[in-house]
Amino acid sequence: MRNKFINLLGSICFCWGVVACTAEPPKEIRSGEIWPDNQGVHVNAHGGGVLYHDGTYYWYGENKSDSTSSAMVGIMCYSSKNLTDWNNEGAVLPVVLNDSTSDIVQGCVMERPKVIYNEKTKKFVMWFHLELKGKGYAAARSAVAVSDSPTGPFKYIRSERINPGVLPFDMNETQRAMLDTLDAEKYKEWWTPMWYEAIHKGLFVKRDLQGGQMARDMQLFVDEDGKAYHIYSSEDLSLIHI
């Protein structure tokens, strides 16, 4: 009996040792290392944002090449259950190849894509920073696309500057009256103390009021009450707007 017990104990220890030796250690997120997707290709999702929906993480980002910062492919999506293993879902908002009049024609700039889920419409809504092809960074537009699925395809809706003709609601009457005193011709030299003072008084808000405010680096946030916020750098990257 004693020998049988010893043999059984030895078998249990051996099996446990085999399991312990063959079990894969938990994966870690390692900053600065190449991060391959499920196809062994480096994840290509720059300036991205992550949406968590129904137990899955969706990572949206810019597809970038080594030779240009322009959009040659479009907005990519990767999905994961654990934030370490990522499946390539492809270009969920590809650039347009056969229409030179499109805002998102190949060669434009598509940056900082963020996606949220609209509970009312049951749509996935993407916002991103858009610069028109051949215009450098002068457009400074926000663009919107929607999809029925987190993995696309997303349908491009439109792009525009933010709130044309609308002043920030937190500007009081004194601040609004101050805008009439600001003459852009007096502040052609940037980064001076006088220029900074004029910026804080609303020099660029006044400059861009008619066409709408600039929107570049950006983020989306949905509060517990379902209200969504668009947070972005504006006024030539000098201030943050919400």
Can you describe what each PLM-predicted range is?
Residues 9-17:
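Bacterial N-terminal signal peptides
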Residues 18-26:
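Bacterial Sec-dependent signal peptides at the C-terminal "C-region" and cleavage site
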Residues 27-30, 84-88, 150-157:
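Beta-strand initiation motifs
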Residues 39, 65-71, 103-106, 132-138, ...:
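Short consensus segments that form the blades of beta-propeller domains
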Residues 46-70, 90, 111-137, 145, ...:
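Hydrophobic core segments of beta-strands in well-ordered, beta-rich domains
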Residues 76, 83, 87-119, 130:
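Blade-loop segments of beta-propeller domains
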Residues 129-222:
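Asp-box/WD-like beta-propeller blade repeats and closely related beta-sheet repeat scaffolds
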Residues 240-242:
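Conserved small/polar residues in nucleotide/adenosyl-binding loops
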